[in-house]
Amino acid sequence: MVTQNKKILIITGSFGNGHMQVTQSIVNQLNEMNLNHLSVIQHDLFMEAHPIMTSICKKWYINSFKYFRNTYKRFYYSRPNELDKCFYKYYGLNKLINLLIKEKPDLILLTFPTPVMSVLTEQFNINIPIATVMTDYRMHKNWITPYSQRYYVATKDTKDDFIEAGVPASYIKVTGIPIADKFEESIDKEEWLSQQHLDPSKPTILMSAGAFGVSKGFDYMINNILEKSPNSQVVMICGRSKELKRSLKAKFKDNPSVIILGYTNHMNEWMASSQLMITKPGGITISEGLSRCIPMIFLNPAPGQELENAYYFESKGFGKIADTPNEAIDIVSDLTNNEETLKVMSSKMLESKVGYSTRKICKDLLDLIGHSSQPDEIYGKVPLYARFFVK
């Protein structure tokens, strides 16, 4: 329990929505605990340190899912065993040091791969407690920070990855990936579907356009899914793509078995009430799906963390990879016409899911911060560096 004033600095990143969602889940949970002696601040380090360059990198990252997959693949898989090699290792260093001097946090929590943190721990002798929340299901070297005291990971397999990379087992906790508590709450599926003017007795296929990737061809997929699985109904989530939503609404306006939605705050209800989901394998989305035990189809996952997530879920029997829309349509047909297979997949997910991840992480963070040193004892060489180089 925190009995004196303490501060947590969360370093996150806005490359995709997942890292920010994880951060917000943790912040919300800590706020709900009404800890009067604890303050929590969060910073998008790279965006604040280099806004123009980071904005360019974000656009490249988003477009890499469509146009530069091989380039991103080479970047993601380059020198996997050289843990200290990263071309952006010093990116954001001055900003990070300024944050430490200004805020004097008692603990740093990373929800985004931040290689620059290793510079502080190795070269500047920072001994402030550092904890990391990994937001995917397979380890990548950029998540490793020397002298970090805690890694919160999704599964035992992820823990084994970290141990193999040299991280002590005692530093790693299998908590699951943090998601909102509402994904643990009971949902009346029949009531929800009836409210949406859908038939609760029919299999519901949930499709998500996702933040990145394809934005065309969904009309073809919906038509063919309904043709091959005529007893099904489809819910299409278009996200923030107004053009996609408008186009699909026009095409399916007279079909009562199809609902077209834009951005929604009700993914929890839709996941809980559907039998199958077609989605991109982002760490947060599939963690929410795992919590709701909804089997998933991963449509043409991008090389890198998405593909690794998809491989992992497929190996565990939680989902299937479809390289093309036609392959996805065939998988939907096979699964909706084989109810027993869907039940087996859901049962495997139920056995494997880790509940209340955010609560577990926050409880452990409070234990870590309760044993942290006083601020004037933890900053090593940073003040001297800052005096001469940091403005």
From Swiss-Prot:
One of its GO terms (molecular function) is 1,2-diacylglycerol 3-glucosyltransferase activity. Its main location: membrane. CDD domains: GT28_Beta-DGS-like. SUPFAM superfamilies: UDP-Glycosyltransferase/glycogen phosphorylase. GO terms for cellular component: plasma membrane. PANTHER family: MONOGALACTOSYLDIACYLGLYCEROL SYNTHASE, MONOGALACTOSYLDIACYLGLYCEROL SYNTHASE 1, CHLOROPLASTIC. Belongs to the glycosyltransferase 28 family. UgtP subfamily. Processive glucosyltransferase involved in the biosynthesis of both the bilayer- and non-bilayer-forming membrane glucolipids. Is able to successively transfer two glucosyl residues to diacylglycerol (DAG), thereby catalyzing the formation of beta-monoglucosyl-DAG (3-O-(beta-D-glucopyranosyl)-1,2-diacyl-sn-glycerol) and beta-diglucosyl-DAG (3-O-(beta-D-glucopyranosyl-beta-(1->6)-D-glucopyranosyl)-1,2-diacyl-sn-glycerol). Beta-diglucosyl-DAG is the predominant glycolipid found in Bacillales and is also used as a membrane anchor for lipoteichoic acid (LTA). This is Processive diacylglycerol beta-glucosyltransferase. It comes from Staphylococcus epidermidis (strain ATCC 35984 / DSM 28319 / BCRC 17069 / CCUG 31568 / BM 3577 / RP62A). The gene is ugtP.
